UniProtKB/Swiss-Prot annotation:
One Gene Ontology term, aspect cellular component: membrane
Main location as per UniProt: membrane
Residue span(s) of domain Protein kinase: 651-921
Gene from which the chain derives: ERL2
Identification of the protein by name: LRR receptor-like serine/threonine-protein kinase ERL2
Biological process per Gene Ontology, one example term: embryo sac development
Length: 967
């Protein structure tokens, strides 16, 4: 009997086990089928969802992006963000009944949001942003009573905002920005007591701003920018005391700004781009929490209230594009944290108040297109951080303050269309970071200062419509970055300098309406980027160079020069000459050619008679007129100078592989050795040979896997030549921005490049004795070998410095877009200057954009996007598609902006930077580096799912951190 009882017990236990197994297997199978149906509706899944395989891997809880409950084994979270997935969202999504979170952002999913999503009643988090979804927002979403976060921004959704969204009791974040939604904002939405974030910008919404908007007692973010809202700002706006960001800009809102707006406690108030009228309420001056006040592009009238000077925490004040009158209040000089002041395009009168010189953090001052008179106050030069100064289109007079030479951070100076007079100060040539100088439309006289040729970062130079005389400086040939030169409508004489032929980046050369004479230099045909040439109405003579790149210019470019001849001006040069002149010209040409031939033969004979021998390191013998070849590493000893010249055919142009601001780079390939890169420096004779050689020997002693080795150098009649390792994949600049880029850089490769460059720079800063500062970190100075290992280059211009000192640069001052503003202001150099530049390189790697492009500054763009919570929109598509963890991208953005903090003391060291980047490298590292074009197949990564990198609160904190530290 006892045995029977025992057997019954065993059968009961066995039955319970079977029941539990069946109970657990069944839902797994159902959810597994749902996941496979979801996969089937996607495209571009080949390399992304390899482990989603119900044949070889039944454990779907281990599939990529799938997270299950530890007890029930039900799918509770699905994260397939930023995988470049196409196709549609399957209706099988509704079969995942226990789903609590789904993130499909950053893909290319089309189609409609399936109604079946309403079956996932446990959903608390939904992010379908940045896809190609279209159609209406399904009403079934209102069934999701647990939903707290709904992000559908950056799609193509149409139709109205469903009023049923108001039935979701726990909804805290609703972001529908940048779609094509129409209709009005449902009034019931304003009665959701828990709603904290409402983003509706960039749609086609109509209606008015409801007085009920202030019923949202928990709302801190209200953004309806860029819609078609009409009506007025409700008087009850002052009751919206929970608002921190209020943006109703770029709508059709009319009327006056209500007085009650002064009761708000917002940090950002954006009303720009509407049709607001009336005066600026003085009560705004009492809004002490304001960091950004933007009332621009309206129809506001009256004076600027002096009480705005009380806004001591405001960093940005935009009042441009209105009809404001009166004078600029001196009280604005009390806004101690002001970085941006834009008062342009108004009707302001009077003088520029000297009190503005107290704004030590001022970055941009724009007073253009007003009716200002008088002088520019000299103490504007006290604004040490000033980067852009624009007073175009006023009635200012007098001379340009000589103190402007102290504005080391200034990159944009526009004094055009005023009544300035006197000579152009030579001191302007000391503002080393200028990229735009516009003095056109004034009464400047005298000659053009030769010092302007020292502005090596200058992109635009406009001196037109003045009373300048003298000649066009030959020093303009040093403006290696220049794109536009306009000196038209002056009284310039002399000839066109042949040195202008050195300007490889020039796009427009405008010299018309002067008194320039002589011939058009043939050297201008070397300016291959030249697209606009105007030399009309001068006294030029001779033949227009018959080169192909001159055929692009219209005949009008040459009109008004009666002694010019050529097909372009309808005057054929040759046939009209008398026979005697033809004979004389032929005779002269023959004699000149004969003389040149004789000189060449003598030179060749002398050159052949001298056998060049390498000089070992340390030797000081250097015969006059001979070549000195210095070997720094023995692997260079197999080369002789004659060999190098023979292989490169005396540095023929066809061996050129790159240009720099101060050098040309050639490739030398020998059958008996590996290729080397030859850098030919423009400045052939440094002032101190011994110092020059000592620096090169110091640099040549550096051996590190992330630093390009200097193997030797030569002082020769061909110039000063430096011999480096040849890097197969060129520079990072070439791969990111070059016109012929052949590979795509995935995130893993970019991270590898960043780590390598950081380790190389950390070695220079911390492991060299004396320590070494690079001074010109930029993407074009980060070279890549065949395995995309980064190596820092251009150490021919670096300097070693004592461990307790900093060094003020006298050779190279960096490159525009990468220059540390503090270095530009003080000319004092330390490691923090390199760290700033490295931060810009990180931004290039993340965004794929140039540091400076068409006057747009990458760093400023990212800071602006940080203010708007849109930083991640700047990420390069090749990064977002191949990075498995978007948190790594965000951390790298943070690191880049820490490196570029305005205060150098707040920047990390390169050792710290290197450690952070290394922490982002997958562990253990893959055995084989994937090609840059694709992610290694079969590689498995677990994706971070922490709330600190996925919630909007992270973006808010990110914005606040950056705003506090960088603005």
């Amino acid at each position: 009997m006892r045995r029977i009882e025992t057997m019954k017990g065993l059968f009961f236990c066995l039955g319970m086990v079977v029941f539990m197994l069946l109970g657990s297997v069944s839902p797994m199978n159902n959810e597994g089928k749902a996941l496979m149906a979801i996969k089937a509706s996607f495209s571009n899944v080949a390399n992304m969802l390899l482990d989603w395989d119900d044949v070889h891997n039944h454990d779907f809880c281990s599939w990529r992006g799938v997270f299950c409950d530890n007890v029930s084994l039900n799918v509770v979270s699905l994260n397939l963000s930023n995988l470049n997935l196409g196709g549609e969202i399957s209706s099988a999504l509704g079969d995942l009944m226990n789903l609590q979170s789904i993130d499909l952002q950053g893909n290319k999913l089309g189609g409609q949001i399936p109604d079946e999503i309403g079956n996932c009643v446990s959903l608390a988090y939904v992010d379908f942003s940045t896809n190609l979804l279209f159609g209406d927002i399904p009403f079934s979403i209102s069934k999701l009573k647990q939903l707290e976060f709904l992000n559908l921004k950056n799609n193509q959704l149409t139709g109205p905002i469903p009023a049923t969204l108001t039935q979701i009791p726990n909804l805290k974040t609703l972001d529908l920005a940048r779609n094509q939604l129409t209709g009005e904002i449902p009034r019931l939405l304003y009665w959701n007591e828990v709603l904290q974030y409402l983003g509706l910008r960039g749609n086609m919404l109509t209606g008015t701003l409801s007085p009920d908007m202030c019923q949202l007692t928990g709302l801190w973010y209200f953004d309806v920018r860029g819609n078609n809202l009409t009506g007025t700002i409700p008087e009850s706006i002052g009751n919206c005391t929970s608002f921190e960001i209020l943006d109703v800009s770029y709508n059709q809102i009319t009327g006056v700004i209500p007085y009650n707006i002064g009761f708000l406690q917002v940090a950002t108030l954006s009303l720009q781009g509407n049709k607001l009228t009336g005066r600026i309420p003085e009560v705004i001056g009492l809004m002490q929490a304001l960091a950004v006040l933007d009332l621009s592009d309206n129809e506001l009238t009256g004076p600027i209230p002096p009480i705005l000077g009380n806004l001591s925490f405001t960093g940005k004040l935009y009042l441009h594009g209105n009809k404001l009158t009166g004078q600029i209040p001196p009280e604005l000089g009390n806004m101690s944290r002001l970085s941006y002041l834009q008062l342009n395009d108004n009707e302001l009168v009077g003088k520029i108040p000297p009190e503005l010189g107290k704004l030590e953090q001022l970055f941009e001052l724009n007073l253009a297109n007003n009716n200002l008179v008088g002088l520019i106050p000299s103490n504007i030069s006290s604004c040490a951080a000033l980067n852009q100064f624009n007073v175009h289109g006023n009635f200012l007079s007098g001379a340009v303050p000589l103190e402007f030479r102290n504005l080391g951070s200034l990159t944009y100076l526009n004094l055009s269309s005023n009544s300035f007079k006197g000579k152009i100060p030579a001191e302007l040539g000391h503002i080393i970071n200028l990229d735009t100088l516009d003095l056109s439309g004034n009464n400047f006289s005298g000659s053009i200062p030769l010092t302007l040729g020292d502005l090596e970062h200058l992109l635009i130079l406009n001196l037109s419509r003045n009373h300048l005389n003298g000649t066009l400086p030959a020093e303009f040939g040093n403006l290696r970055s220049i794109q536009i030169i306009d000196v038209s409508f002056n009284f310039l004489a002399g000839v066109i300098p042949t040195e202008l032929g050195q300007l490889q980046n020039i796009n427009s050369l405008i010299l018309n309406n002067n008194k320039i004479h002589g011939k058009i230099p043939d050297q201008l045909t070397n300016c291959f980027s030249l697209a606009n040439l105007n030399i009309s109405f001068n006294n030029l003579s001779g033949i227009i160079p018959p080169m192909k790149n001159f055929t692009r210019f219209s005949p009008a470019s040459f009109f008004g020069n009666p002694f010019l001849c050529g097909n372009w001006v309808g005057s054929i040069c040759g046939p009209s000459l008398p026979k005697s002149q033809v004979f004389t010209r032929v005779a002269v040409i023959c004699m000149v050619l004969g003389f040149i031939t004789l000189i060449c033969m003598i030179f060749i004979a002398v050159y052949k008679s001298k056998q060049q021998k390498p000089v070992l390191k340390g030797s000081s013998k250097q015969p006059e007129g001979s070549t000195k070849l210095v070997i720094l590493h023995m692997d260079m000893a197999i080369h002789t100078f004659d060999d190098i010249m023979r292989v490169t055919e005396n540095l023929d142009e066809k061996y050129i592989i790159g240009y720099g601001a101060s050098s040309t780079v050639y490739k030398c390939t020998s059958k008996t050795s590996r290729p080397i890169a030859i850098k030919r420096i423009y400045n052939q004779y440094p002032s101190n040979f011994r110092e020059f050689e000592t620096e090169l020997e110091t640099i040549g002693s550096i051996r590190h896997r992330n630093i390009v080795s200097l193997h030797g150098y030569a002082l020769s009649p061909f110039g000063n030549l430096l011999f480096y390792d040849y890097m197969e994949n060129g520079s990072l600049w070439d791969l990111l921005h070059g016109p012929g880029k052949k590979v795509k850089l995935d995130w893993e490769t970019r991270l590898k490049i960043a780590v390598g460059a950081a380790q190389g720079l950390a070695y220079l800063h911390h492991d060299c004795t004396p320590r070494i500062i690079h001074r010109d970190i930029k993407s074009s100075n980060i070279l890549l070998d065949g395995n995309f290992e980064a190596r820092l280059s251009d150490f021919g211009i670096a300097k070693s410095i004592p461990a307790t000192k900093t060094y003020a640069s006298t050779y190279v001052l960096g490159t525009i877009g990468y220059i540390d503003p503090e270095y530009a202001r003080t000319s004092r150099l330390n490691e923090k200057s390199d760290i700033y530049s490295f931060g810009i390189v990180l931004l290039e790697l993340l965004t794929g954009k140039k540091a400076v492009d068409n006057e747009a500054n990458l760093h400023q763009m990212i800071l602006s996007k940080a203010d708007d919570n849109t930083v991640m929109e700047a990420v390069d598509a090749e990064v977002s598609v191949t990075c498995m963890d978007s948190g790594h991208i965000k951390k790298t953005f943070q690191l880049a902006l820490l490196c570029t903090k305005r205060n150098p003391l707040e920047r990390p060291t390169m050792q710290e930077v290197s450690r952070v980047l290394l922490s982002l490298v997958p562990s253990p590292p893959p055995k084989k580096l994937p090609s840059p074009a694709k992610v290694q197949e079969g590689e498995e990564r677990r994706e971070s799912h922490s709330s600190d990198t996925t919630t909007p609160q992270w973006f808010v904190q990110f914005r606040e951190d950056i705003s506090k530290s960088s603005l």
